[in-house]
């Protein structure tokens, strides 16, 4: 999109990582989201949900924190790659809880979820819209969400604020973008 001709017909999806995070993580981007791209409209923004395999012994955030403190580096979290909302949410949780976990990046969020469901990683922060089908099918157990208020989609799942981590608040977002001009 950044290199496309601004013809009024070329549009794409922009989200959290390539539009807001990558510029600070990677010094040699071939585009500048501030000068090469025009935002058109915000389509959605929503919290992430911390999920574990249903056979996991972890049922609460406190369970995870206790296990991580007992064995630093003994728990893993998957993500859809470096610098995205999956990873940054987990890193924010680690920082605020004073724990250390191992990041296992995948080429996509769905690959990270698949390995979580297979029991190969401990947990993942995922967008609610992509985790919900697996939560409803009892293939994932939700632990907490990253919004200020509980979600009507998961009314029995606490927020990180409720369980003592008010700074673990993350909203992922996506919108339509076009080339500048």
Question: Language-model segments: which ranges?
Answer:
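Hydrophobic residues within well-ordered alpha-helices
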Residues: 1-2, 25, 90, 116-117, ...
């Amino acid at each position: 999109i950044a290199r496309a001709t601004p013809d009024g017909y070329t549009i794409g999806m922009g989200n959290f990582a390539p539009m807001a995070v990558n510029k600070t993580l990677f010094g040699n981007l071939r585009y500048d989201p501030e000068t090469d791209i025009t935002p058109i409209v915000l389509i959605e923004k929503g919290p992430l949900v911390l999920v574990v395999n249903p056979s996991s012994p972890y049922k609460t955030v406190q369970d995870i924190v206790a296990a991580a403190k007992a064995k630093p580096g003994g728990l893993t979290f998957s993500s859809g790659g470096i610098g995205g909302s999956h990873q940054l949410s987990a890193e924010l949780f680690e920082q605020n809880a004073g724990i250390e976990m191992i990041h296992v990046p995948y080429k996509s969020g769905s690959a990270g979820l698949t390995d979580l469901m297979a029991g190969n990683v401990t947990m993942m922060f995922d967008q609610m819209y992509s985790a919900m089908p697996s939560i409803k099918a009892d293939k994932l157990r939700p632990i907490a969400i990253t919004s200020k208020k509980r979600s009507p989609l998961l009314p029995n799942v606490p927020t990180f604020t409720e369980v003592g981590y008010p700074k673990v608040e993350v909203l992922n977002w996506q919108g339509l973008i076009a080339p500048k001009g």
